[in-house]
Amino acid sequence: DLKVLRWLLGSASFFVAVGALVIFQPELRRMLGELGNLPLFVTTHEQRENIEVIIQTVERLADVKIGALIAIEQSIQLQEAVESGIVVDCEATPEMLETIFFPNNAIHDGGVIIKGDRITHAACIFPLTQQPDLNKTLGTRHRAAIGLSEETDAPIVVVSEETGAISHVYKGQMVRG
């Protein structure tokens, strides 16, 4: 009788394990994919180059008052924003970023996500901040930058299309330029 009980429990645990794999397959696939995409390290040289690209771009966009919203993905993945955007997957260059944000371009609205030296997504919708005491002159782009930075560790750069001012947002705090 113990042999039968042992066999039933062994079989049941096998079927439960297989059932769990089938039921949670999409989540497991996404989790394994995310583990495979974790950057082990980014060299200081690569970081400097990426920052330089973003600085060049936002300065040029600010000069001609073209609005921009750029999030640099760090350790917290920007999954919700990514799912709302369009996959771009190209090298992050000033020319490419300027092309994306050029007015009337099909993907100029929303934010861009940069991971490493790649533009991964464009036309992303970032969550708006719920802070009630923000300056009423801040537009949607700035509110989206603050909102995303409240939920993630991504530094975000904003160019105002009204004033050409460049702002930096990190962990819910904005520094206006």
Predicted regions and their residues:
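Divalent-cation
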Residues: V4-R6, V16-G19, F24-Q25, R29-G177
